[in-house]
């Protein structure tokens, strides 16, 4: 394994889940695998769970870790070819990438959507430059259109807590004051479509996710109807993906608070567990009583980020030896 950007890079999910539960029993089982190997984590955007869990995962495997915050202390980077660099950007990404790669064995990149150009975002311009020019294994720590480490942790959590063989899992849009990328819902849909679950997506009209992520999932515009009999509710906001109206890409089309996940919504489920990737806007995405209920999984879900990252880095390290 050399790259990790989506569910297909991981291969068979049952095998990956078995590895995850093996590692959860003994986080240090492979502590010598990363000896004398360095993991470089490059952050173009803020992070809490990804930053901490990925560093912890790398150290579980015996790796050294370097963390670079591109916008704090490093030179400002130009990402476009052909640009006359007479502004405030001192270094081009095309030189910076091979330089950074020379100091490490594996690279993680976190770079959000800019909402300036849908094509640039959905072709993963920044992440793919690292894949193309670094010559090293590269993994996504959340890119413009996907967050596979989060989705893998979500799947681990569902597998741990499910009460039936094939649970009903609902991804629901919820309101937020800002325009947020589609990375988390895209990846969640990507992974749930490969898992053994009854998967439903619900959102207001105009918020249709890209078909390559939705695939065969049922889409329901009536949120209450979607929630009926659900075993897991996964709440997340996302800005308009621009699928039906490209000119609306990245816009906030609605802040309809009736989509906030509250006790009335949860009452029509089958005593469903509540999930969210965090950070969460309380009483916009979800009410206090729901996120604080015993059925809220946001903390164990976040803890599983260490496990998903450990499995991923283990696979990449084993790929170096192949």
Task: Give the location of each predicted region.
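Rossmann-like adenosine-cofactor binding region
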Residues: 212-289, 295-296
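Phosphate/diphosphate ligand-binding glycine-rich loop within oxidoreductases
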Residues: 34-41, 47-159, 281
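Glycine-rich phosphate/diphosphate-binding loop of Rossmann-like nucleotide-binding domains
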Residues: 44-62, 66-67, 159-236, 241-242
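C-terminal helix-to-coil terminal segments
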Residues: 292-322
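Phosphate-coordination loops involved in phosphoryl transfer and adenosine-cofactor binding
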Residues: 33-39, 166-168, 271
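Short, structured coil segments at secondary-structure junctions
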Residues: 61, 133-134, 195, 215, ...
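Positively charged, low-complexity intrinsically disordered leader regions
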Residues: 1-52, 56
């Amino acid at each position: 394994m050399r790259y990790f950007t989506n569910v297909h890079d991981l291969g068979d999910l049952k095998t990956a889940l078995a590895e995850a539960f093996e590692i959860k029993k003994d986080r240090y089982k492979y502590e010598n695998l990363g000896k004398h190997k360095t993991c470089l984590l490059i952050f173009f955007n803020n992070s809490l769970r990804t930053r901490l869990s990925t560093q912890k995962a790398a150290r579980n495997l015996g790796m050294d870790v370097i963390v670079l915050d591109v916008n704090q202390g490093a030179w400002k980077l130009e990402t476009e070819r052909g640009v006359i660099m007479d502004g405030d950007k001192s270094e081009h990404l095309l030189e910076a990438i091979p330089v950074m790669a020379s100091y490490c064995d594996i690279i993680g990149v976190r770079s959000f959507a800019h909402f300036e150009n849908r094509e640039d975002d959905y072709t993963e311009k920044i992440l793919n430059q690292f894949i193309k020019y670094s010559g090293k294994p590269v993994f996504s720590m959340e890119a413009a259109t996907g967050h596979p480490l989060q989705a893998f942790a979500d799947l681990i959590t569902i597998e741990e807590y499910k009460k039936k063989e094939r649970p009903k899992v609902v991804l629901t849009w919820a309101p937020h004051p800002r325009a947020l990328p589609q990375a988390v819902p895209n990846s969640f849909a990507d992974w749930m479509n490969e898992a053994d679950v009854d998967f439903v997506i619900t959102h207001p009209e105009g918020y249709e996710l890209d078909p390559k992520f939705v695939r065969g999932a049922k889409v329901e515009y009536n949120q209450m109807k979607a929630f009926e009999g659900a075993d897991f509710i996964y709440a997340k906001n996302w800005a308009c993906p621009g699928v039906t109206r490209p000119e609306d890409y990245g816009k906030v089309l609605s802040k309809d608070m009736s989509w906030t996940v509250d006790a009335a919504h949860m009452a029509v489920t089958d005593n469903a567990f509540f999930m969210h990737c965090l950070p969460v806007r309380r009483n916009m995405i979800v009410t206090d009583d729901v996120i604080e209920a015993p059925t809220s999984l946001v903390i164990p879900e976040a803890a599983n980020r260490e496990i998903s990252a450990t499995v991923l880095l283990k696979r990449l390290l084993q790929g170096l030896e192949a």
